[in-house]
From Swiss-Prot:
Gene giving rise to this polypeptide: Cd81
Membrane-spanning parts: 13-33, 64-84, 90-112, 202-224
Positions of the record's site feature: Important for interaction with integrin: 116, 144, 148
Cited Pfam families: Tetraspanin (PF00335)
Disulfide bonds: 156-190, 157-175
Domain notes: Binds cholesterol in a cavity lined by the transmembrane spans.
Entry membrane topology: Multi-pass membrane protein
Name of the molecule in the record: CD81 antigen
Purpose of the protein: Structural component of specialized membrane microdomains known as tetraspanin-enriched microdomains (TERMs), which act as platforms for receptor clustering and signaling. Essential for trafficking and compartmentalization of CD19 receptor on the surface of activated B cells. Upon initial encounter with microbial pathogens, enables the assembly of CD19-CR2/CD21 and B cell receptor (BCR) complexes at signaling TERMs, lowering the threshold dose of antigen required to trigger B cell clonal expansion and antibody production.
Subunit structure: Homodimer. Part of a complex composed of CD19, CR2/CD21, CD81 and IFITM1/CD225 in the membrane of mature B cells. Interacts (via the second extracellular domain) with CD19; this interaction is initiated early during biosynthesis in the ER and enables trafficking of only properly folded CD19. Part of a complex that includes MHC class II/HLA-DR molecules and IFITM1. Interacts with IFITM1. Interacts with IFITM2 and IFITM3. Part of integrin-tetraspanin complex composed of CD9, CD81, beta-1 and beta-2 integrins in the membrane of monocyte/macrophages.
Residues holding cholesterol: 219
Extracellular side: 34-63, 113-201
Length: 236
């Protein structure tokens, strides 16, 4: 015997929420793939300074997002099918998956909040090391190539310290052609550009995580209510 009345409304409401959840998983998967192949970040994070590669923490987070998006699409499909079939087993499995996903998202959110500035900090340190080598050693061709890639990709020149800014003025060959004047150099600080590049992407990820968390809470409530309704209807 199928569910009736308010429980039937909850059934279709849960189906709609799960469809939205499935779509959200697809969006997160798409955004993660876009972030993974974004030309600016790819260019910078594939650089190597001697034997030292650029920091890879950002990509670790992206790979986690790709996995989360794929799992969300699977769980969303499971919830849709379980709601339509009125299966307590599928709904129970769906609820368990949601709880695990929610716990992982909370843990990842806490870690991300604590380390939100670490990615940009690591990239800035990598840039400063390359800039220092390029300025101190005329034969440091690898370091010069790394610095030029940063400057051309982000359209900046030098860091925010007076020393590196002064040396950058003396090394116009390392800077974009539009940044030859001292006034322009003051405006085009590479540390600031690095912060803008990564903070914007992290805010985008944070907003998506909050939206998904709200949907998951509603789905957990609705799935339990529907599961109880199915159990009660089978008694009668």
């Amino acid at each position: 015997m199928g569910v009736e009345g308010c429980t039937k409304c909850i059934k279709y409401l849960l189906f709609v929420f799960n469809f939205v959840f499935w779509l959200a998983g697809g969006v997160i998967l798409g955004v993660a793939l876009w972030l993974r192949h974004d030309p600016q970040t790819t260019t910078l994070l594939y650089l190597e300074l001697g034997d030292k590669p650029a920091p890879s923490t950002f990509y670790v987070g992206i790979y986690i997002l790709i996995a989360v998006g794929a799992v969300m699409m699977f769980v969303g499909f499971l919830g849709c099918y379980g709601a339509i079939q009125e299966s307590q087993c599928l709904l129970g499995t769906f609820f368990t998956c949601l709880v695990i996903l929610f716990a992982c998202e909370v843990a990842a959110g806490i870690w991300g909040f604590v380390n939100k500035d670490q990615i940009a900090k690591d990239v800035k340190q990598f840039y400063d090391q390359a800039l220092q080598q390029a300025v101190m050693d005329d034969d440091a061709n690898n370091a010069k190539a790394v610095v030029k890639t940063f400057h051309e990709t982000l359209n900046c020149c030098g860091s925010n310290t007076l020393t590196t800014l002064t040396t950058a003025v003396l090394r116009n060959s390392l800077c974009p052609s539009s940044s030859n004047s001292f006034t322009q150099l003051l405006k085009e600080d590479c540390h600031q550009k690095i912060d803008e590049l990564f903070s914007g992407k992290l805010y985008l990820i944070g907003i998506a995580a909050i939206v998904v968390a709200v949907i998951m809470i509603f789905e957990m409530i609705l799935s339990m209510v529907l599961c109880c309704g199915i159990r009660n209807s089978s008694v009668y």
